Amino acid sequence: ITNRGWRALRDALMYGAEKPDYKEFYQVGLELPSDDPDVLAGQPLRGANNWPRFMPELQRDMNAYFEAVAVCGPALLHGVALSLDIDPDFFVDKYFEPLQRTQAVYYPPQPVSLSDDQFGVAAHADFGNITILWQDDNGGLEVQNLAGEWIAAPPVPDTMVVNAGDLLGRWSNDRYRSTKHRVVNRSGRERISIATFYDPTFTTKVDPRD
């Protein structure tokens, strides 16, 4: 299972949600040939991307973005390690083959006729280590604080959002807590975001005692 390619509007149901997400998206990962050892071994989320033949510029631009974020990931994790007062290179050998997926997400304007429990992305926390998110200027991202209140996380020019996931919460003994979030596109305009899930090598042993 590579989980690559395009998903249609309302084709994805977030775990625990009652209604499918009001979005469509295109997802890519590290491009690996069919004879790669991980692919031959049937390792999940490893393989080739599904590129549309009629849109060659998509492959060019997505690959460029994918590679740029791959440079950001190690620097962010270096900062995480410093903040935890552990070896700054703690994550390096856990990421010798990062499990990185990048998802370009399109949110249509959400009609007022839709019910209040219809979300662009239903409430959830990412299951991985860190998520690096670019979003356009239309807003719609909301995060839940410790009191259970939903607060807007409006886009800030020339910045990206970094979410801690469940894995980082476990790895850090909850010094980092995974961020529950959702999207409701009430802007009346199309919304675009690009999320990159930057996770360790598939075979990495995660031990909070480290």
Where are these regions (language model features)?
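Peripheral, non-catalytic segments flanking oxidoreductase cores
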Residues: 1-210
